[in-house]
């Protein structure tokens, strides 16, 4: 659309004004600044991704996570640790990709900067030449106008002295008038020459301004397209990162689906079982019960030194003079 073209909307009625050109340059500078900001954003995001990836890698490799689990849950945890490791590697790789995209943005900015510099150099020269020629034309105009006023004064002096001045004075006035007329003619030619030169310079400047507008508009279209595509690509990379992460986590989910509570319980029992017979009940033992010395189940019978029976009563042997019993014992008091 014509109304959207730079060359049709950035003019000024003042021949010395650069307001339209300056407006375009300011917009291009802002665009370049925006590209630099996105470039810095990518670099900082890359640093964040790299740090996160390395921290996640250290977490996966150094921090224990269910290391004493067994059987199917152990295998699921091993898959989990491996996939977390893979996710960390993906984030580190993403950081490298983001730095590469930042480098491309930087190269694009520098390329446009060089292209703009050529056009700006031409426009700066055109502005200087236009301004200088305008000054010359205005100086020539002032000189021409002054010579015209001098001629008019000389003519008026001749008319005033027609009846009062002598012949010698009139001759001087006529010489001055002739000189002023010659000066007017010369200044008029110089003025016309500078005006013609100014017009040529103005046309050249206007042509260069149109070319510059076309170059700058093409650059701005290219910049917007490049910036948009770079942002689009960045989002695609982040989406791919999410998809890759989900695929890795899906491997963990599949491993968890194979996890069997029954198998893990059975595996633990088979590996760590200690026996299938529980201990017998502890029975009450009456101290005076004749069955209290009976051996409990699982134990062999034998003498219990802590619980002995009554001592045997010896038989009386009266014929043995050296033998006596307690009944024959008495205390002697002296």
UniProtKB/Swiss-Prot annotation:
Phosphotyrosine: residues bearing it: 323, 329
Any one cellular-component term (Gene Ontology): cytosol
SMART domains, A to Z: FCH
Membrane topology: Peripheral membrane protein
InterPro entries referenced in this protein's UniProt entry, alphabetically: AH/BAR_dom_sf, F_BAR, FCH_dom, PSTPIP2_F-BAR
Tissue: Expressed in macrophage-containing tissues, including bone marrow, spleen, liver, kidney, intestine and brain.
Molecular function in Gene Ontology: actin binding
Keyword terms: Coiled coil, Cytoplasm, Membrane, Phosphoprotein
Protein name: Proline-serine-threonine phosphatase-interacting protein 2
Domain F-BAR residues, every copy: 4-264
First-listed, main subcellular location of the protein, grouped into a coarse class: cytoplasm
Localization of this protein: Cytoplasm; Membrane
PTM comment text: Phosphorylated on tyrosine.
PANTHER family found in the cross-reference section: PROLINE-SERINE-THREONINE PHOSPHATASE INTERACTING PROTEIN 1, PROLINE-SERINE-THREONINE PHOSPHATASE-INTERACTING PROTEIN 2
Pfam families the UniProt entry points to: FCH
Region spans: Disordered: 288-322
GO biological process: cytoskeleton organization
Role summary: Binds to F-actin. May be involved in regulation of the actin cytoskeleton.
Coiled-coil regions listed in the entry: 66-163
Species assigned in the record: Mus musculus
